[in-house]
Design a protein with these regions (language model features):
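Mid-domain, small-residue-enriched loop/turn segments at the edges of structured enzyme/sensor domains
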Residues: 8-65
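Extracytoplasmic
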Residues: 6, 24-29, 51, 87, ...
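Short helix- or helix-capping micro-motifs
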Residues: 1-3
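Structured C-terminal helix/loop/strand segments within mature extracytoplasmic catalytic/sensor domains
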Residues: 13-16, 59-160
Length: 160
């Protein structure tokens, strides 16, 4: 639920750049580029890893369908961490992300899925949203709000 980059930066050197690349490739996660061994603690933040919105949706769809090369235990541990919000007959799973660069526009992500048990539009809705971050203080909170409004607009979530 919280961004814990420092934990990931402690773990990734133990895994190694080559193994991380192998997992990302097996997941079909964007270009799966972890860069050089020196990039192992930043490849997803400021490094060469990139993913499009469509690729993100494809990855999340595989995650939702349990169609990634992961154990049942891994799914059982990972999916609840993404639970962001619940309602009477729905659960919203989501994660934020932020790409920051000195050379390019900062980009904020909000990705996940909605499990809807009833209402006007039952089913699972996978989403990936990114936006340019001009003013972090105001733009960062707009990501979840924009996605939530889109889900309301298509009838997948009730209006607040």
């Amino acid at each position: 639920r919280h961004s814990t980059v420092w934990i990931y930066q402690t773990i990734t050197p133990r895994i190694g750049s080559e193994a991380l690349h192998g997992w990302l490739a097996a997941f079909g996660y964007g270009n799966a580029d972890t860069g050089t061994p020196e990039d192992v603690t930043t490849y997803w933040l400021k490094g060469p890893l990139s993913i499009s919105v469509r690729e993100q949706v494809a990855f999340l769809t595989r995650l939702v369908r349990h169609d990634l090369p992961l154990s049942v235990r891994t799914y059982d541990l990972a999916v609840p961490v993404m639970l962001a919000e619940t309602g009477e007959d729905w659960r919203l799973y989501a994660k934020t992300g932020w790409y920051s660069s000195d050379e390019a526009q900062d980009i904020g992500w909000y990705v996940g899925w909605l499990e809807q048990g009833g209402g006007a539009a039952p089913g699972t809705y996978v989403f990936a949203f990114n936006m340019d971050i001009e003013t972090p203080e105001t733009d960062i909170p707009r990501r979840p709000a924009a996605v939530r409004q889109a889900l309301v607009d298509i009838g997948a979530l009730p209006a607040p």
